[in-house]
Amino acid sequence: MPFRDKTNRLIVEIQNLRASGASDSILAEIVAKAVHSGPEAIDKNGVPYIEHPRRVSSIVSALFHEHSQLEANAYSAAWLHDVIEDSQTHFGEAVTKDDLSLMGFNGKVVDAVHLLSKDADYIEEEYLDRIANDEVAKLVKFADLTDNTSPLRSSGLNQDRRTRYQRYWNRLVFNRVK
């Protein structure tokens, strides 16, 4: 793997902040901002991409009435949910599942972010099955779909993407295949 200067600096920064007592939720937000704040990190509507994970984490937070470990994991994963998938484009370097582990995020958060990340071998049905079987990933995907299909964002969606999101809703929320 080529030298990853920015990624390695980010890992060290997060490790140092964690050592000084920063919470996972704050650290997840810092990582998301670092990865999604470059000049390439603009969504299809011309809005800075960081606003998407901010909204997704807010939706996750609104789903809970009392603090729990599930909420904490889902909130952190919501901030991080596109970091692995989009880091090469937005950050200029890959951020991997192993990098998130090195930063100290717990296994449930790291696993959920990994499950939510599409790779080059992405097969939709397998992707949805993996998410459906992970409580944290499913909550984050619900919040992600809620944001992606909101009137604020959906005006910039093409028909293929709208159809794909409907399939995701059907499978993950309504438990219907097809």
Set out the residue ranges of the language-model regions.
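Active-site helical microenvironments for divalent-metal-assisted chemistry
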Residues: M1-K178
